[in-house]
Amino acid sequence: MVLCTVLAVAALLSSCHGIYNDLEPCSQGVRLRFVYDYNMEYANAFHSQVDCLALLVYDEQGNYLVTYIGTGDELKDENYRMTLDLEKGSYHFIAYGGLTCPKTSFSFKAVPGIGSIMQDLRVEMHNAGRVSETDLHPLFHGSLDMSVDNGAYEEATVYLMKNTNNIRVVLQQMNGGEVDDKNFTFRITDDNTLFAPDNSLISNGGQVYAPWTQGQRTVGVTEEGDETVTVAYAEFSTSRLVAGNHTRLTITRNSDNAQVLNIPLNEYLLLLKSDHFDKMGDQEFLDSENNWSLIFFLDNNHNWIRTHIVVNDWIVRINDAEL
């Protein structure tokens, strides 16, 4: 199986038709719509969040054929469709949002080309293995299998999932005392920097995330109403969180190098699912929510009070026996 002449000539096009007008166009293909509604709002945010798009086309044997690119204002149009002129046959499409932008934080391990196969496709976070203190550019993934018949353009939708997370950690003293972020070292560790074609993670060695921003903020008054509360915060940007990975959040007190907390991060995030989103699977929940906020409460000696935390504005009671 081959692509029509125009695709065989063009290795990187935003659409098949409209270029090489002297060549006979295909008479069939697909028109693809792209949707990102795999989120907690269940609303399509593709046009507001995806600023560049790459669509890889493979034949039914998994042989690479061509890459299509979409960029700029065309993606903001809710009527945007990507038109592909294809010969009759079965195809596998893999879409990446945010991968081909100038500010991308991810790239292909090897750029797909003629002779490459789908099973070898790999996407890796930049500077994997080094401490990451970057606000990662959002990355999205989607895939679709479909067939093309003679003389028809099939309409289809590629549904995307977001692979990047923003995690905000807040330290607050229970009695309302000031907490200074400079007194603590915040880290997240995981192994989540290398993606397979199906968006699953491939072990790539440990990854350390440091905050891309941190500081102090006054958030209100104490329960008595007589004092403002100054908290410390640290904000992380990470790759995909996967249930079963040994993802950990550690906070160390710099004065004596003692660990204030060392917790299995994903399990703590899933405490919120248990209480409020129990109908969702663990991985569905982690993939649907991409903006996290966790508040930990400290005593006067800056030790963690292990009774409850606040996750995304919900109070979650802690039972250590469950973790």
Q: Where do the model's predicted regions map?
A:
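Bacterial N-terminal signal peptides that target proteins for export
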Residues: 1-3
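Tryptophan-paired
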Residues: 53-108, 180-275, 323
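A sequence/structural signal for flexible, mid-protein segments enriched
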Residues: 127-226
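C-terminal motif of bacterial Sec signal peptides marking the signal peptidase cleavage site
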Residues: 12-15
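Acidic/polar, low-complexity intrinsically disordered N-terminal segments immediately downstream
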Residues: 18-111, 273-323
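Short, low-hydrophobicity acidic/polar segments
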Residues: 67-162
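Extracellular beta-sheet/turn segments enriched in Thr/Pro/Gly and aliphatic residues
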Residues: 118-162, 263-323
